[in-house]
């Protein structure tokens, strides 16, 4: 029943929440009744979305500035969100980045560390802090947003793919660490048409679409089904899982 997806009375924290897939998740959580903490590096964008959520659904919502690639920022974000909302029932580690580079030999140490920091180190720290509180309290759900690059890496995004593969492994380990009260799962999105994709070459887009079994890129709202499933009681017996939402792009089952 639909009530299995109800999040009334819950608090969800979404990193990278002000745009793209993160924004869609925030909208979905608010629509399901959850209070929403929107976090990203840009406070203005987070606050604007929080105000939109409050106006459209009546839920509590607030924006938080945080660069989750930095350990100290993660610590401050956790304290600020718990101070504002009292708890976190759903953590979505969505913030990520895959900067372009001209060649593998030209990947700088700074770029490599930044990619690992944002896509792997930050999610670990947030999950460690919040998962510990969840396990000591009323439980909760942690959702790591990975990528099909974790299982189908490409040469022009290797640091990103390696970080996301690590995030998949982290998901399984965290599920063991925080069981039985906390469920930890991951979603591997394929290629979605977000604001980031607007600058892509149309010819390249067309060729890429033809390699996807469903013959198209995903629309941002299509991430919502898996997200609500994992956040809610609908997935009460699901933990340590990695779910592809990719139109069939990646091989196998992750």
Residue ranges, per PLM feature:
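Substrate-binding pocket helix/loop in short-chain dehydrogenase/reductase
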Residues: 74, 102-104, 108-116, 197, ...
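Conserved glycine-rich cofactor-binding loop
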Residues: 11, 18-19
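Short C-terminal tail/terminal secondary-structure segment
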Residues: 1-4, 98-101, 152, 227-228, ...
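Catalytic Tyr-X3-Lys loop
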Residues: 105-124, 143, 167
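Active-site helix of classical SDR
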Residues: 127, 163, 171
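Residue(s) in the substrate-gating loop at a strand-loop-helix junction
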Residues: 147
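The beta1-alpha1 cofactor-binding region of Rossmann-like NAD(H)/NADP(H)-dependent oxidoreductases
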Residues: 43, 65-77, 109, 221-222
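Alpha-helical segment proximal to the catalytic Tyr-Lys
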Residues: 132, 175-180, 236
